[in-house]
Amino acid sequence: MKILIVTQYYSPEQFQINEIAPELVRRGHEVTVLCGVPNYPKGIVFQGYETADNCKQKEREYYKQTGVRVIHAKQHPRGHNPFSLLRNYFSFVKNSKEVIRNLSPNFDVVLGYQLSPITSMYAAVEYKKLYGTPLMYYTLDLWPVSAESILKSSKNPLMLPVTWMSRKIYQSADRILVTSLPFMDYLSRVNGIERERMGYLPQHAGGGMMLMDLQKETHNGCADFMFAGNLGKGQRIDVIVNAAAELGARTDYKVHIVGDGSMRSSLETMVKEKGLTNNVVFYGNQKRDDMPSFYKKADVLLITLRGNNEVGNTMPGKLQMYMTTGKPILGAINGAANEVIKEAECGACVDAGNYKGLADLMKSYIESPEKYKDCGANARRYFTEHFTFEHYMNGLERELQTLIAK
């Protein structure tokens, strides 16, 4: 297959599509990725990508390494304010569509790796309009509901055109794969997508840590909890901080927060105001290859997500990654993730936003860790049965081939 992947975010930005595209090449397919100039999450262009010539050099190097042809569309960096973020969104729409008009008409299929914003898929829609090529989305973020976090309210007057735009973009697809089953209900109800046009393909996680011994290196008489990932508003890390505040400034636990994002500064302020600087530690972004050494510090992994709309029913890819570590998982999260944690018997979960309930779970581990002794093995077993990279790639390849054959 000749596959065109459209995604606003790609390597060296850390998203799972970075593993998917090279694997498609290894399976014998020709892959081109159209993406933006990397600047996520800090809103600053990555070193080595500052100019068009720099990007061309990086594209040549990446092709030699992976066989994936990458084309960077110019875009305004995300910056640090809503105006700059909107410029980022719209500049990618404009410039990615210009790139599309200069591409070969010979692709067999277009795969839109659909994160936020939904406008990042306009280039994929443009290619389909020009050449009639079948279009598939892999939908990780739901729209228009995801726009509520940007517009601050579902009652914002701008939600009306955003809803119209989202419907048009989704309805342009021939096939939509979703990462969580509740997505199907929302896409059908809000965007008018027929059930037969949708399929379920949960995110994968690399299995590299499955065979690693990530048991805690030293038993320091302290329960070490860890959150690893994006520190955005939707992740509700404030629930973890408030849970720590319920436990208080005691010496028998620590919370390690590994990652970066728009809420980091306010979370650090929150920790200081609550007198928890000895209990809650921030490490910033870390390279993926360095993460095993961080997981070794942890007894338990924490997962939280906003729960006031359909976004809170998703199953973040973080959950699958956590499962590969063989650690118990405690969560304050709704929907599919809540169900999987309970079904896998890999930890315990309360509803999204319930910081007191999460504090009770953390206290339970601190006082009786033996209750969770089988959770890590259960997590790895469930992952092997449902979430391996090979399982994911077989499903994606099959879906693409079926769509082309129609």
Tell where the protein language model's regions lie, with residue ranges.
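N-terminal subdomain of nucleotide-sugar transferases
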Residues: 1-57
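An aromatic- and histidine-rich active-site surface loop
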Residues: 14, 86-96, 109-146
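Donor nucleotide-sugar binding/catalytic pocket of nucleotide-sugar-dependent glycosyltransferases
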Residues: 156-213, 220, 280-282
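Acidic donor-binding loop of glycosyltransferase active sites
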Residues: 174, 279, 295-312, 327
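Conserved donor-binding/catalytic core segment of Leloir-type glycosyltransferases
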Residues: 218-244, 256
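Nucleotide-activated donor-binding/catalytic signature segment of Leloir-type glycosyltransferases, i.e.
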Residues: 256-258, 265-292
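A short, well-ordered alpha-helix in the C-terminal region of glycosyltransferases
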Residues: 357, 364, 371-386
